[in-house]
């Protein structure tokens, strides 16, 4: 019998049979993982098995390639943001993006920590900029980090104004020349310079979305609707 214990955030839950549930969690040391919770569809478990809930998890299975079963204990609920439409959309986008980007059972310790911090930040103003930075980390985890440190043409670190939609590298204003209208404008929010305005966050998400959408279809997984709903709410202000 195989067994481990870990801490994780609940990404999704679906009914399994009459009384059980299959949950998907993002754990600190075991990555994105699925398992059955016996009695998970019961009234007792319903308040615990909510998106974003932080759980103490024990997983058991006979063989490593079996789905296995979880026993769960609540550590922290995030139901406090459920009355905030934008924050709830942010939480749903986080859970959905982790589902489509991360392979199963592959540890991403740094990303797990940053994901928990982002979920915590949803209760306070200003989190959309943190969400943008988190999507940049997702790109890194997917193997395609943006290089915004210097101009791809000249090597200069000054006056970076655009991002190439082909390479994900920054381009200086002067170096862009006649190609400027074919490049993404580079918002300062992506460079971590100054406060991030709503339009800058949306510009940044257009860039991260372009590269995430380009990379993910290779695995047959388009960007989730939850992300589109978040961007729509951000655009409405």
UniProtKB/Swiss-Prot annotation:
Signal peptide: none
UniProt keyword DNA damage, yes or no: yes
RNA-binding in keyword set: no
Pfam families, per the entry: RecO_C, RecO_N
Entry GO CC: bacterial nucleoid
GO term, biological process aspect, one: double-strand break repair
Matches recorded under InterPro entries: ARFGAP/RecO, DNA_rep/recomb_RecO_N, NA-bd_OB-fold, RecO, RecO_C
Function in brief: Involved in DNA repair and RecF pathway recombination.
NCBIfam families: reco (TIGR00613)
Family: Belongs to the RecO family.
Protein name from the UniProt record: DNA repair protein RecO
The organism of origin for this protein: Cereibacter sphaeroides (strain ATCC 17025 / ATH 2.4.3) (Rhodobacter sphaeroides)
């Amino acid at each position: 019998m195989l067994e481990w214990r870990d801490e994780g955030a609940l990404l999704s839950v679906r009914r399994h049979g009459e009384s059980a549930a299959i949950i998907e969690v993002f754990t600190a040391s075991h990555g994105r993982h699925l398992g059955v919770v016996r009695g998970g569809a019961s009234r007792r478990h319903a308040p615990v098995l909510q998106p974003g809930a932080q759980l103490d998890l024990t997983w058991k299975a006979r063989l490593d390639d079996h789905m296995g079963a979880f026993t769960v204990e609540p550590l922290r609920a995030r139901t406090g943001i459920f009355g905030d439409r934008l924050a709830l959309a942010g939480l749903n986008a986080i859970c959905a993006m982790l589902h489509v980007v991360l392979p199963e059972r592959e540890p991403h310790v740094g990303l797990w920590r940053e994901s928990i911090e982002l979920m915590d930040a949803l209760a306070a103003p200003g989190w959309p900029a943190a969400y943008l930075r988190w999507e940049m980390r997702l790109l890194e985890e997917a193997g395609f980090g943006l290089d915004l440190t210097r101009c791809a043409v000249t090597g200069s670190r000054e006056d970076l104004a655009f991002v190439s939609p082909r390479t994900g590298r920054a381009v200086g204003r002067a170096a862009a020349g006649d190609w400027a209208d074919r490049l993404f404008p580079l918002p300062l929010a992506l460079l971590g310079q100054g406060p991030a305005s709503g339009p800058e966050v949306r510009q940044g998400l257009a860039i991260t979305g372009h590269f995430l959408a380009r990379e993910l279809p290779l695995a047959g997984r388009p960007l989730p609707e939850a992300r589109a709903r978040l961007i729509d709410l951000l655009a409405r202000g």
